[in-house]
């Protein structure tokens, strides 16, 4: 049996099917050429603090609709989606992530999940207009990159990764 590649994907455009789930599929396609993929989708911008606490305590915690009180219903909620890409199974599964932004605790959580890569999508937001949930996302990206886990930021994800590693990110005039 071949190995399954595990990717944590910070899904910040979930409410836009063409950029959210469609974009996630585009990001995962090259990985799926080589192996089956388990994509663990986290949505810190929509998730409850309680779900984050459960994730910190228990590790891999699936979420239900009750755990995402800020869900944008322009796109329907689902817990899991399976498909085939390049002859390999790809499973997209929504999970909770810690929101606290504490790096030591985030490292423990990342170790318990054991991802092969971490990806942060684009977003309608930017880091120059900071929101509380960005602390948890930034901690995840900072910790994964410092742990030697391949970490990719796309658009906003690039801003968040740079900011979390200490770079100055400014909005262009």
Where are these regions (language model features)?
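Active-site loop->helix "elbow" adjoining a glycine-rich segment at hydrolase catalytic centers
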Residues: 156-158, 165
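Active-site neighborhood of phospho(di)ester-bond hydrolases with catalytic His/Asp-centered motifs
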Residues: 121, 152-154
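Proline-centered loop/turn at the N-terminus of a beta-strand
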Residues: 150-152, 168
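A conserved active-site-flanking secondary-structure segment within enzyme catalytic domains
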Residues: 163-173
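Hydrophobic/aromatic ligand-binding patch that stacks against planar heteroaromatic rings
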Residues: 143, 160-161
């Amino acid at each position: 049996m071949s190995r399954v590649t595990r990717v944590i994907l910070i899904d910040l455009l979930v409410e836009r099917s063409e950029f959210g789930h469609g974009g996630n599929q585009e990001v995962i396609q090259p990985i799926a050429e080589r192996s089956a993929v388990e994509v663990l989708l986290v949505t810190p911008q929509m998730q409850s603090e309680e779900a984050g606490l459960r994730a910190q305590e228990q590790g891999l915690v699936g979420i239900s609709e009750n755990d995402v009180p800020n869900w944008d219903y322009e796109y329907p909620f689902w817990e899991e989606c399976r498909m085939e890409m390049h002859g390999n199974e790809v499973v997209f599964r929504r999970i909770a992530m810690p929101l606290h932004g504490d790096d030591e605790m985030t490292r423990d959580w990342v170790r318990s999940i054991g991802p092969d890569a971490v990806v942060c999508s684009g977003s309608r937001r930017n880091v120059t207009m900071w929101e509380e949930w960005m602390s948890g996302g930034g901690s995840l990206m900072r910790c994964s990159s410092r742990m030697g886990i391949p970490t990719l930021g796309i658009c906003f994800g690039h801003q968040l990764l740079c900011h979390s590693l200490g770079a100055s990110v400014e909005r262009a005039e």
